[in-house]
Amino acid sequence: MTIQNVIDRVRMIKTGCVIDDLRVIEDINRVENYIIKDIVSKRTGDEAAQDYGNYDEETPRDRELLAPAPYDTVYVDFCCAQIDREYEDSERYVNSMASYNNGMTQLKKWWWQNHRQKKLNRFYERGF
C-alpha cells in the first residue's frame, strides 16, 4: 500500500470529515515507527526498515509502506481511529482501534514467524 492509497481510503471511509493530507501522513509515521520499534527491530531483516517512518509533505505519494498486504490495513484503521477521536465519536474510535490492534497482532505474528530472532553477542534478544 502506498501513502496515496491510505489517504484515498481514509477519505472514502470518512466522507463527512475534513481530512488534511499532512495529518494522515503524520499518523502513517506513527504506525511505521511503532512497527519498526516493536516488531521489526527485534528480528533479522530490520535493515529493510531504515528508510521508513520519516515521511512529510514532500515525500512522493507513490511510496510503498513497510507493512505488506494483507496487514497494511493497520494504516487506514489507525488514521480512521484518530479522526474518530478528534470528532469525539467514541463508538467508532473503539471499533477502529480494535481493528488496528488486531491487524498489528497479526502483522507481529507473521513477521516473527518469517524472521529469525536477532542474536546479540552470544544471547538472543528476548521478544514476544
Predicted stretch roles:
Residues M1-E64, N102, Q106-F128:
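Conserved short "hinge" loops at termini or chain/domain junctions
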Residues T73-R85:
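Short, hydrophobic/amphipathic alpha-helical patches that form generic packing surfaces
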